Amino acid sequence: MISISNVSKGAIIRFKGEPHSIESLMHRTPGNLRAFYQANMRNLKSGRNVEYRFSATESVDVIITERKQYQYLYRDGSDFVMMDSETFDQINVPEIAIGSASRFVKDGITVTIVFSDDASILGVELPTFVEVEVTETSPASKDDRATSGTKPAMVETGTEVSVPMFIQTGSIIRVDTRTGEYIERVKK
């Protein structure tokens, strides 16, 4: 147990018996009242966001974690089968552990899996940016080049991304896995 004042963003704590990741933590001292820490946390089992006020003197249980590199192999129902890059052991990772970024998991991608001290999976971290191929989009016309609008495009992972008008089928684009937004076209 350590004081909440020694915890920082990204730490994983045990809150009400379940693992939570600290998304943001702000110290507040309102007027002549007692100081507190306003925490926004994400429940790593359910994926729900939780807000909580910790008193400045409160202690929390920080979970000791281990991070390992794994490579995505294939999908088995709602699970993702990953292989340890060092030992070649395979594990099944539930979709909820990856969260909304699961729509950008593609063959061969290397991810970081966060394990707790009891070897259970707390979360999966994808690279911040991934390069995907556009498999389907409406064809570009001369009028499209003059405007700065966007159009929907289907990428190789099966998800839809909003892209600029000049992107064509077969283009490779870089996408932010946190937001799902188009970043840039990749020239190869």
UniProtKB/Swiss-Prot annotation:
GO molecular function, one term: translation elongation factor activity
Record SMART domains: EFP, Elong-fact-P_C
Alphabetical keyword list: Cytoplasm, Elongation factor, Protein biosynthesis
SUPFAM superfamilies reported in the protein's UniProt record: Nucleic acid-binding proteins, Translation proteins SH3-like domain
A Pfam family: EFP
Location in the cell: Cytoplasm
Official protein name in the record: Elongation factor P
Organism: Pelodictyon phaeoclathratiforme (strain DSM 5477 / BU-1)
